[in-house]
Regions:
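Long, histidine/aromatic-enriched segments associated with O2/redox biology
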Residues: 1-276, 281-283
Length: 284
C-alpha cells in the first residue's frame, strides 16, 4: 500500500491463522519476500548481498532460510517433494492470475510457511506407518491405492476438487536445517492464482476433512511462520515509475537457489530464503 496505493490485488490479505487442538498455523507479519533460486549458492549470496546493500536502510530482515536440494528432490522426512506439480501450460494456469483480476494479470499469490520436524519421533515410525501418513511409497514415490490410503493422508487432504476437477498449485518447497542444532525442516512455498486453494488445503490439514480427521504429519511437524504475498508480473514491475522509496518502509528479504523450472524433477535448490519486514508499524 505504501509503494503502490490502490487498487490492490483482489485476494491479497493477511495470512489467516488456524488453530485446532494442539495444531496451529501461525500468521507472521511481513511485507516483502525475495525467493531466489540458482544452481550456485555463491550467486544467491551475491544477489541478496546487493539487494540488502540497496534497501538495507529501509528494511528489517525477520527471517532468512537457506535451502538446498536433498538427494532426488526429497524432503528431510525422506519422501520426494513436489511429485504432483503441474508442468508447462498447466503450471501457468495453476499459478497465474488472469482475467479475474485484469490489473494484476500475470501475477501470482504465494504462501510461505516454515515447518520444523521432530525427526526423533518421526524416525521411530516404521516405513509403512510413514507411508500411510504421507499417502505414497517412500522409496518408489508411488501413490498408495485408494484402498490402502487413509483419508487423513497428507496427499488426500491437500487434494482440492472443484466442479469435479482437481485444482493444482505450484510448489517449490525447500528442505533446510542445522544438524548441529537439531534443526530439520521444510520451507513450504506454494504459488497459486488464488490463495483460497492453499487456504483450503491448510484448513483440511489443521482442522480436518471432516473436522477431526486432520493431517497426521502435523503430529511431527510444526509451523513457525505463515505469510501470504502477491507476486507482481515482470510487466507490472517494468511499468512502475522509479523514484525514492518511502523511508518508513520495512522489507522482507529471502534467498533460495533456483533453476528456471520449479518442477520437481528438474529444479535445483541450494540457496537461501530470507524474509524481512517494513520498519513502520501499522501498515499493510
Amino acid at each position: 500500500d505504501k509503494l503502490f496505493g490502490k487498487p490492490r490485488p483482489a485476494e491479497l490479505h493477511t495470512f489467516r491463522e488456524i488453530r485446532s487442538g494442539e495444531r496451529h498455523a501461525v500468521s507472521t507479519p511481513a511485507d516483502v519476500l525475495f525467493h531466489i533460486r540458482s544452481k550456485r549458492m555463491d550467486m544467491c549470496f551475491e544477489l541478496v548481498t546487493q539487494i540488502m546493500e540497496r534497501i538495507g536502510g529501509a528494511v528489517s530482515a525477520v527471517d532468512e532460510t537457506h535451502g538446498f536440494r536433498y538427494f532426488d528432490d526429497r524432503d528431510l522426512l525422506g519422501f520426494v517433494d513436489g511429485t504432483e506439480n503441474p508442468r508447462g501450460e498447466a503450471a501457468l494456469n495453476a499459478a497465474l492470475v488472469t482475467e479475474e483480476d485484469p490489473q494484476f494479470a500475470g501475477g501470482s499469490y504465494v504462501i510461505v510457511q516454515k515447518y520444523l520436524h521432530d525427526m526423533n519421533e518421526w524416525n521411530v515410525l516404521s516405513t509403512e506407518e510413514q507411508e500411510r501418513i504421507m499417502g505414497r511409497k517412500k522409496l518408489s514415490d508411488i501413490e498408495l491405492s485408494d484402498a490402502a490410503k487413509p483419508s487423513s493422508a497428507h496427499n488426500a487432504l491437500t487434494t482440492i476438487v472443484e466442479n469435479g476437477k482437481e485444482v493444482k498449485i505450484l510448489r517449490d518447497n525447500m528442505p533446510f536445517g542445522k544438524p548441529g542444532h537439531g534443526e530439520f525442516g521444510t520451507y513450504f512455498i506454494g504459488y497459486s492464482r488464488s490463495p483460497r486453494t492453499i487456504e483450503q488445503m491448510l484448513e483440511n490439514m489443521f482442522i480436518g476433512r471432516p473436522p477431526g480427521n486432520y493431517d497426521r504429519l502435523l503430529d511431527f511437524s510444526r509451523a513457525v511462520t505463515g505469510t501470504l504475498f502477491f507476486v507482481p508480473s515482470a510487466t507490472f514491475l517494468d511499468n512502475v515509475v522509479s523514484g525514492s522509496p518511502s523511508p518508513s518502509l520495512q522489507v522482507e528479504t529471502a534467498k533460495a537457489p533456483a533453476t528456471d523450472d520449479p518442477s520437481p524433477r528438474q529444479r535445483s535448490r541450494g540457496g537461501s530464503l530470507g524474509i524481512g519486514s517494513l520498519k513502520e508499524v501499522g501498515h499493510e
